[in-house]
Amino acid sequence: MEEYEDFEMEDLSELVSYMDYLETQRLTISQLDYSLSIPPQLLVSREISKLEDEVCEMLKESSLFQLFRKHKGYLNVTDLVLPLWCEVQHEYYLLRRIKKKTPKMERGIKLHQILEYETSPPSERRVLDRTSKEEPWALRLLRQLEGIMLLQKNGITREFPIWGYYKESSIFGIIDEISLNNPSKSNFNSDIRNYFNFKMYDLSFVDNKTRFSSRKPGASQILSSKVQLMYYVHLFLNYFPSLGEKQQSIFRDISPTYSNRLHSQSHWWNMFLSQLSLDGTKDLGPKFLEQSILSIPDIPEDVFAGHNSLNGLYALVFASAKKLHLRLTDDNLTIAYRNDKTGEVVYKDKFSFSNKLLEASYTKAYQFWHNLREPEGVPAEEVYKCRSCEFQKECWWLKKKQYYPLSSP
């Protein structure tokens, strides 16, 4: 089974179950209009009374990123959006190293798996050499290649891994669903060297969220879902920059500071490999080559044999996507909320990409993960969130603000 970024334990996805029955007031971009300048100091000093002494000392020396994500070398997309619910709660979970898997989360994972298997059969691809740092990323590249072929053949692919940069941060995520508006199935050719030959189609992105009730999700939950999908779109376009080269779209300038770097295929890719200490030229070996050939039989064996490395597989993925002739439009982003038992879509929210919202959200998340300021808890109008929080009694933010979360919103 593929890894499901939405439900990784360290991403604290159990917060979604808290969000389900909570209503909230409407959030606007102005509520995320934080200063985009980074404070000069590296770490924020904390009052000892707010957290345990040893925790405070630890945070004076290291940031949350250094403590909990530096070993991976990147942040997951959900790492950037989950603190939007409550940064203080998120920090408590990280520092206490609390990991839970609830029945609701299990149902969500199962639903995602069912949706994935609707578009692609179960894969037996696995890491063959557990000492290799390159193989896990090679498997993700194979999944990308398979996803592009499914997109061409069936007009839809699900659980598409994607990674890259937003400003100074390396990010990894898994896109729930990518689809073409009017795909053609008639011109599929088994030879990768000439199977891409069809008209231009609009590209749509969908993020499937599990709902545990029939009620419309609250604005706070909708906000984080929108930001999450916008991260995916940003990563996808910068991973495949040729898709937006000739289009007059807001997607062309998502991250102006880094656009030149990210739009250079070799530059950003080599930078990513270097940051994670990966060898892009290392041959993945005969066993992995055999696995590649068996898992995607539509690609000729000699093609795989000539691309049996991270650089080689990325070149295949990049070349294949470049020939897709896709067109990106500003409003083809959708959040689909599904019943956790039946999988039925109970609510859809279609929206447009917002550079301002994404940048403001990212700046806040970056400051949180790198301890550039004190974590922020919920404002007074959202104190209802605290009723289901297990840190309610000890929460320093509530004590500081003198909120009373047991009262009704």
Curated annotation (Swiss-Prot):
Binding site for Mg(2+): D176, D207
EC number per UniProt: 3.1.-.-
Keyword Iron-sulfur: yes
GO biological process terms on file: interstrand cross-link repair; mitochondrial DNA metabolic process; recombinational interstrand cross-link repair
Cofactor notes: Binds 1 [4Fe-4S] cluster.
Effect on the protein of changing D207A: Impairs exonuclease activity
One Pfam assignment: Exo5
UniProt protein name: Exonuclease V
Recorded family membership: Belongs to the EXO5 family.
InterPro entries named among the record's database cross-references: EXOV
Organism: Schizosaccharomyces pombe (strain 972 / ATCC 24843)
One GO CC term on file: mitochondrion
Binding site for [4Fe-4S] cluster: C86, C386, C389, C395
Enzyme class: hydrolase
